Amino acid sequence: MVNIDLKDAGGLPLAYLGDAVWELTVREYFVEKGYKINTMNKKVKKLVNAKAQSVIFKSILEDLDEDYKAVARRAKNSNIKSFPRSCSIMEYREATAFEALIAAFYINGETCRIKKILENHISEGEK
């Protein structure tokens, strides 16, 4: 795993790493299911976007311990310069916090936790 001290790490670099980890986890999930590329791509896009990540973030926030909440808070309050038009500023901030959490789980070797979050947020029709 990566050797980063989460207490010193900035929110945006963590979100950058978490974005890659989340997308890879989602892609692996659907590849293992054996979908065709077009179908896989549509399913991945439903989970790898700011709106979806914002929803997931809000659903897991209460279950986090204080160290992870601190990581999320730092990322959410980071000095983000630009925002996409596809979501609100708050959704984008929450998605950034979610991605930072995914990086924190990854750094701490909690990849099973990332997969569990994914499985809990895939609708029955998506499985």
UniProtKB/Swiss-Prot annotation:
<dbReference type="InterPro" id="IPR036389">
    <property type="entry name" value="RNase_III_sf"/>
</dbReference>
<dbReference type="GO" id="GO:0004525">
    <property type="term" value="F:ribonuclease III activity"/>
</dbReference>
<feature type="active site">
    <location>
        <position position="19"/>
    </location>
</feature>
<protein>
    <recommendedName>
        <fullName>Mini-ribonuclease 3-like protein</fullName>
    </recommendedName>
</protein>
<dbReference type="GO" id="GO:0005737">
    <property type="term" value="C:cytoplasm"/>
</dbReference>
<dbReference type="GO" id="GO:0019843">
    <property type="term" value="F:rRNA binding"/>
</dbReference>
<dbReference type="InterPro" id="IPR000999">
    <property type="entry name" value="RNase_III_dom"/>
</dbReference>
<keyword id="KW-0255">Endonuclease</keyword>
<dbReference type="GO" id="GO:0006364">
    <property type="term" value="P:rRNA processing"/>
</dbReference>
<dbReference type="InterPro" id="IPR008226">
    <property type="entry name" value="Mini3_fam"/>
</dbReference>
<keyword id="KW-0540">Nuclease</keyword>
<comment type="similarity">
    <text>Belongs to the MrnC RNase family.</text>
</comment>
<comment type="function">
    <text>Might be a ribonuclease involved in RNA processing.</text>
</comment>
<dbReference type="Pfam" id="PF00636">
    <property type="entry name" value="Ribonuclease_3"/>
</dbReference>
<keyword id="KW-0378">Hydrolase</keyword>
